[in-house]
């Protein structure tokens, strides 16, 4: 673990790391059999990029160097990810509409790296600064937990990665037992709170008018449908996906809904 903070962070290493990360991310994003799996999470969510950022800044000797090199890493890697995908995507350069988030994140690395650099102090300020990243990783771990539960084993690697990365940061960047104990507490609390806040809505109810209703569902594997005696319909998550639910009353009234299951939650949209 000590080797993690003992590297010489040259400009050559920053640029090569940015290019390698971009190529790997783009390739994983382009392969269709990785859809909705941990292997594409690197292209969507920030946890892997937190690792890259921390690796760069803790191996810099000054806060100014940390800020500039972290900024340049993201300035190269993020647009390159989309540029590599352009020739293989129907959207072409339209893919860059998704770069807006990462452009904002890239700009924020300048002040962010200055603050994060304080983790090298090895004191309670280090614990406070690191706790922000640990709390975020705990939040992401909870999010992936519900995704795994909804479509096991998809995202299981991402769940394990977030927990292990948080623990790695604790033992690689903090030295005192009291600091580590507090940091581990932050991880556990953030996971527990996030599990409660992010708990999916496994079932939704559609209220109908009186009378007898029948239904058809385009893809029954996505959601389970139950007609209740109180003139309502219960929709329960089965697996990730989208399907069309059509309800018809005995008088001929017709109602249509898009049913989306994502992260274990059920979302219902009315079709006018």
Residue map of PLM features:
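Structural signature of hydrophobic alpha-helical transmembrane segments
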Residues: 37-48, 97-104, 154-160
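Structural signal for the C-terminal ends of transmembrane alpha-helices
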Residues: 56-63, 115-120, 169-177, 196
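Membrane-proximal helix-loop-helix units in multi-pass membrane proteins
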Residues: 79-151
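Extracytoplasmic soluble-region selector
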Residues: 137, 190-272
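Membrane-interfacial entry segments at the cytosolic side of transmembrane helices
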Residues: 174-187
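N-terminal topogenic module of multi-pass integral membrane proteins
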Residues: 1-74, 78
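Aromatic-anchored segments of alpha-helical transmembrane domains
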Residues: 22-29, 74-84, 133-144, 188-198
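Hydrophobic cores of alpha-helical transmembrane segments in multi-pass inner/ER membrane proteins
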Residues: 49-57, 104-117, 161-169
């Amino acid at each position: 673990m000590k080797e993690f903070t003992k590297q010489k962070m040259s400009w050559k290493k920053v640029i090569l790391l940015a290019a390698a990360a971009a190529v790997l991310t783009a390739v994983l994003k382009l392969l269709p059999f990785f859809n909705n799996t941990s292997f594409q999470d690197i292209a969507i969510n920030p946890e892997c990029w937190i690792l890259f950022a921390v690796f760069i800044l803790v191996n810099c000797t000054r806060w100014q160097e940390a800020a500039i090199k972290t900024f340049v890493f993201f300035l190269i890697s993020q647009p390159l990810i989309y540029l590599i995908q352009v020739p293989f995507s129907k959207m072409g350069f339209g893919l860059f509409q998704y770069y807006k988030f990462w452009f904002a994140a890239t700009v924020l690395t300048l002040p962010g790296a200055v603050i994060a650099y304080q983790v090298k102090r090895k004191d309670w300020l280090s614990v406070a600064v690191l706790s922000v990243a640990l709390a975020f990783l705990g939040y992401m771990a909870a999010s992936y937990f519900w995704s795994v539960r909804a479509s096991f084993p998809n995202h299981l690697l991402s769940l394990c990665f977030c927990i292990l990365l948080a623990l790695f940061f604790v033992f690689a960047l903090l030295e005192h037992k009291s600091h580590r104990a507090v940091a581990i507490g932050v991880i556990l609390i953030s996971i527990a709170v996030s599990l409660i806040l992010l708990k999916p809505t496994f079932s939704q109810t559609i209220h109908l008018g009186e009378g007898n209703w029948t239904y058809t569902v385009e893809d029954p594997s996505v959601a389970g449908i139950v007609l209740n005696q109180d003139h309502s319909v219960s929709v329960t998550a089965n697996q990730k996906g989208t399907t069309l639910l059509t309800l018809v009353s005995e008088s001929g009234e017709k109602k249509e809904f898009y049913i989306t299951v994502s992260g274990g939650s059920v979302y219902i949209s009315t079709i006018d």
